Amino acid sequence: MLRALGARFLDSAGDEIEEGGLALKALRQIDLNRLDERLHKVRIEVACDVNNPLTGLHGASHVFGPQKGATPDQVLALDEALNTYADIVAALLQKDVRDFPGAGAAGGIGFAAKAFLHAEFRPGVQLIADLSGLSQAVQGAVSFSEDGCTERQKPTAL
């Protein structure tokens, strides 16, 4: 996401690193000189329905990696790479948001949104309901809702 907005992720030689989470192990510097200036003038809200941090046993790699087919060794390597990334971001921005609830969302996009874009996080259903005027639309109505499956990470899980 940050690359698409103009950020460059550099290794120790000043070359751009490869794409992908494991490539973050080689990260040594983040160049924000080309970051889109319009980002400083907007308020960003993120629809986020998970509270996972970026790293650690409850982080993106450990929780979501196995769901995507990552082996235990790949999970550990990815968590190490994400910690490298978080360390560099913390030094660059003088703040560490790796443990922010939602930082581990979408493979770490939550972390980038919070750290670089100062995004505010809201539950997805709340954001959509507010934007669509749902509370006014259903006043006086009876509404039934169902979720196709229950996952352990959802707050409503048993």
Range-by-range predicted roles:
Residues 1-43:
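Glycine/threonine-rich beta-strand-loop-alpha-helix active-site module
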Residues 77-144:
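Oxyanion-binding "anion nests"
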Residues 126, 149-152:
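Histidine- and/or cysteine-centered catalytic micro-motif in compact active-site loops
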Residues 50-51, 55-96:
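Acidic, glycine-rich loop-and-beta core segments that form the ion-binding/anion-interacting portion
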Residues 7, 12-14, 39-43, 59, ...:
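Short coil/turn connectors at secondary-structure junctions
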Residues 153-158:
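Glycine/threonine-rich flexible loop motifs
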Residues 43-51, 146-150:
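Short beta-strand segments
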Residues 2, 6-13, 65-83, 123-130:
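Gly/Ser/Thr-rich active-site loops/lids in small-molecule metabolic enzymes
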